[in-house]
């Protein structure tokens, strides 16, 4: 038997703020701006221990893993409303601006549609605290996995995981949830030849919330309920003679996840069915050239037949890494994502986009490497995500990061 103990602790401090168009008046060519600042302080501790070993029964080899995991998160979330002063529309949370490109506001100071200067206060004595929420999340898990070598070419995988999740939310709004779930897993792997194998698997997955956002929780809200998934998958893996490995997989996923409705400011569980397939090529074409390419096709529908939010039909990526010398390597990648609806049942879409990334690394010594990564090389304007139909996230423009990594 071999035991493994793991412990980790993280401190997370995040702030994001947003000004967005909450209303539009076509007749007067104006837009009403609303906004918020959200701060999150989170501490997470994770402890896990597992045992692995092998034994035989009646000539059949079992590879066993058994373990336990405990997660605890303390989450402190504050939200502050926009506060436009002087207040010209009897609602300091919003202000009306004439539509122009760019809009006449910068650094939270702007001129409204009547020509009056107004300032939005996110900090200082004039800021307005809209919500204070404290969340305590505890998850205790036990798991068992057995890989059984039935023959030299056939393996059976059996497993199960028990999760107990307890979430307690207090503050401006309150809520609580406790769930006990057993998630089974079964799979089979058949080696057809030394180069080819096929597999099939079924699993249920229970995904507790990780403590990111718990603001505006009501007693009957499903926002803090866990995500649940049923996954059925089968596929093939083949080692090509040119140094690449090809994999193809078909999958069906039945998911239950809470989806937030901006209009009602509550979350409801949305059941969805996702079917699709994945194709992947990965490996080394030469001693110097490594390539990874993948394509995914999705057919994602909610229970009523509407397209599922942010589930594009087509996704493609390719990544190349070329070793110029023992010390210098360069890389180039392309990511494509097809269009998707912003909200389940909505006709508003996030348009498709293509992003090009590049980079280079140089080994200064055996243990120290300097690396330059450039994201969005062509400075593509794209929208990877949207909170709602009027709050789309803009992808970062061309940017670069230089890092030095040392191993001790």
Write out the residue ranges for each language-model feature:
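Residues on the lipid-exposed face of transmembrane beta-strands in outer-membrane beta-barrel proteins
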Residues: 49-53, 142-148, 186-190, 234-238, ...
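Gram-negative outer-membrane beta-barrel transporters
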Residues: 152-153, 249-254, 267-344, 378-381, ...
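Face-selective signature of the C-terminal outer-membrane beta-barrel domain
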Residues: 1-12, 35-170
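Transmembrane beta-strands of outer-membrane beta-barrel proteins
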Residues: 1-5, 62-68, 156-158, 198, ...
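Membrane-embedded beta-barrel scaffold of Gram-negative outer-membrane proteins
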Residues: 1-8, 12-18, 191, 197-199, ...
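Outer-membrane beta-barrel channels and translocator barrels
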Residues: 1, 52, 56-59, 151-153, ...
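C-terminal beta-signal and adjacent terminal beta-strands/loops
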Residues: 339-343, 361-408
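Surface-exposed extracellular loop regions of Gram-negative outer-membrane beta-barrel proteins
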Residues: 74-76, 166, 176, 189-233, ...
